[in-house]
Amino acid sequence: MTFAKIKFSAQIRLETGLHIGGSDAFAAIGAIDSPVIKDPITNIPIIPGSSLKGKMRTLLAKVYNEKVAEKPSDDSDILSRLFGNSKDKRFKMGRLIFRDAFLSNADELDSLGVRSYTEVKFENTIDRITAEANPRQIERAIRNSTFDFELIYEITDENENQVEEDFKVIRDGLKLLELDYLGGSGSRGYGKVAFEKLKATTVFGNYDVKTLNELLTAEV
């Protein structure tokens, strides 16, 4: 019986400010209109695994779906086996586990004199009819922040012969994300990211990851 778990790790570097919204259920007068999601323990920005998974799946659907899928449950088999499918007749658990990504270079930012790991960007919309202004404050994780990124991929008898194909899809997803954006307001310059120090490691069982590491660093 084959059973192994592969950890895919990388660093996400923010090339522009990133906004992934947090809770604004309570906002005092003068507070930021749209705060970013933060770790409740440290109050430092995080990148939720759900945001990474959802964005990557959406981008890959444009490549690997033969037709436009109205819902994720209508995705192609290759995406369903990686990300999961909740549709009754096609239900399956995904082979990928996405972890939340936490800030990893706080000390470096501190040494540069950074006083806060977030910034506030002031934006404005103008009503074209009334010329009324609608100013708002958007919080962003700052440029040059890096976050530890981690995926867990499970290998069993069922997918032992599909591992390399799956990792090519993962590689494509990372490249597409670099060419797109993460979080909100990407068309206005937010959320440009780069994946660095890509590495696959066997963390349970026996599996030679040499070929996988070659795939991850190959040009798309």
From Swiss-Prot:
It comes from the Bacteria. Its EC number is 3.1.-.-. The keyword Nuclease applies. It is an enzyme of class 3 (hydrolase). Pfam families: RAMPs. Its cofactor is a metal cation. Target ssRNase is inhibited by EDTA. Changing residue 100 to A: Nearly wild-type degradation of target ssRNA by the Csm complex, crRNA is shorter, Csm complex is altered. InterPro entries: CRISPR-assoc_RAMP_Csm3, CRISPR_Csm3_endoribonuclease, RAMP_III_fam. One of its GO terms (biological process) is defense response to virus. Changing residue 19 to A: Wild-type degradation of target ssRNA by the Csm complex. The keyword Protease does not apply. Endonucleolytic cleavage of target ssRNA by the Csm complex requires a divalent metal ion; Mg(2+) has the best activity in vitro, but Mn(2+), Ca(2+), Zn(2+), Ni(2+), and Co(2+) also support cleavage. Keywords: Antiviral defense, Endonuclease, Hydrolase, Nuclease, RNA-binding. One of its GO terms (molecular function) is endonuclease activity. Encoded in a type III-A CRISPR locus. NCBIfam families: cas7_TM1809 (TIGR02582). Part of the Csm effector complex that includes at least Cas10(1), Csm2(3), Csm3(5), Csm4(1), Csm5(1) and mature crRNA. The Csm complex is elongated and slightly twisted with a maximal length of 215 Angstroms and a diameter of 75-80 Angstroms. It has been modeled to have a central protein filamant of Csm3 subunits along which the dsRNA helix of paired crRNA and target RNA binds. The filament is capped at one end by Cas10 and Csm4 and at the other end by Csm5; ssDNA is thought to bind to the N-terminal HD domain of Cas10. CRISPR (clustered regularly interspaced short palindromic repeat) is an adaptive immune system that provides protection against mobile genetic elements (viruses, transposable elements and conjugative plasmids). CRISPR clusters contain spacers, sequences complementary to antecedent mobile elements, and target invading nucleic acids. CRISPR clusters are transcribed and processed into CRISPR RNA (crRNA). Belongs to the CRISPR-associated Csm3 family. This is CRISPR system Cms endoribonuclease Csm3. It comes from Streptococcus thermophilus.
